[in-house]
Amino acid sequence: MAVGKNKRLTKGKKGQKKKIIDPFTKKDWYDVKAPSQFAVRNIGKTLVNRTSGTKIASDGLKGRVFEVSLADLQNGEIAFRKFRLIAEEVLGKSVLTNFHGMSMTSDKLKSLVKKWQTLIEAHIDAKTTDGYLLRFFAIGFTKKRPNQIKKTAYAKTSQCRSIRKKMTDIITREVSAIDLKEVVNRLIPDSIGKDIEKSCQSIYPLHDVYIRKVKVLKKPKLDTAKLLELHGEGVASSGDAGSAVRRDGYEPPVQESV
């Protein structure tokens, strides 16, 4: 008789279930922090695999983009404007973010388009003082002149061209003289759109003038010290509340429609 293992005795039971391991036991939660110019600093949490061997958790977090409504960032009612924030640095259990773009909700944009008026759009590339190249998309609509009887408010092609040039000049002039932090401060109340509306009154009356979208095309190398300054010298000292953004001499426009 051959000496060896009895294979039948070593076999396991058929249909035996595998041990189920919960994947969340290998993950950690991190707090996502918005820059200090927003009223609400703690905007949510994000999940990432724990540091294991050569795979570092912070590397998996950097570059993540979070889209947050302005109403959630400012405890306000303007929910149609959305800000994109990109994870730049990880400090302890906190993810420090920076501005990565802005857009308006599609339902708000569709509600602005009406009959008997002209839609005017412009897109402009402008560079900030700290090296960020941004692309701005502006939108505006013509409206009736005071005491106008005619129901239509159509602008001529030459007037549209002049308004478009005015949009380009105002955005380029304002953005090229300030840094990214100040650009965000002006996007929160959309004061650039109000400036365009006032400047174009002599060409043709406008209403519902907005910066509908902002893209970050190029950005300089990450400066950690500047990022910490943007977040109020570290998360531990800054807390969960930011500072209110105000602009002297600026009054927010009255919303004709929601």
Swiss-Prot record:
<comment type="similarity">
    <text>Belongs to the eukaryotic ribosomal protein eS1 family.</text>
</comment>
<dbReference type="GO" id="GO:0003735">
    <property type="term" value="F:structural constituent of ribosome"/>
</dbReference>
<dbReference type="InterPro" id="IPR001593">
    <property type="entry name" value="Ribosomal_eS1"/>
</dbReference>
<dbReference type="GO" id="GO:0005829">
    <property type="term" value="C:cytosol"/>
</dbReference>
<dbReference type="GO" id="GO:0006412">
    <property type="term" value="P:translation"/>
</dbReference>
<comment type="subunit">
    <text>Component of the small ribosomal subunit. Mature ribosomes consist of a small (40S) and a large (60S) subunit. The 40S subunit contains about 33 different proteins and 1 molecule of RNA (18S). The 60S subunit contains about 49 different proteins and 3 molecules of RNA (28S, 5.8S and 5S).</text>
</comment>
<keyword id="KW-0963">Cytoplasm</keyword>
<dbReference type="InterPro" id="IPR027500">
    <property type="entry name" value="Ribosomal_eS1_euk"/>
</dbReference>
<keyword id="KW-0687">Ribonucleoprotein</keyword>
<dbReference type="Pfam" id="PF01015">
    <property type="entry name" value="Ribosomal_S3Ae"/>
</dbReference>
<feature type="region of interest" description="Disordered">
    <location>
        <begin position="235"/>
        <end position="258"/>
    </location>
</feature>
<dbReference type="InterPro" id="IPR018281">
    <property type="entry name" value="Ribosomal_eS1_CS"/>
</dbReference>
<keyword id="KW-0689">Ribosomal protein</keyword>
<dbReference type="GO" id="GO:0022627">
    <property type="term" value="C:cytosolic small ribosomal subunit"/>
</dbReference>
<protein>
    <recommendedName>
        <fullName>Small ribosomal subunit protein eS1</fullName>
    </recommendedName>
</protein>
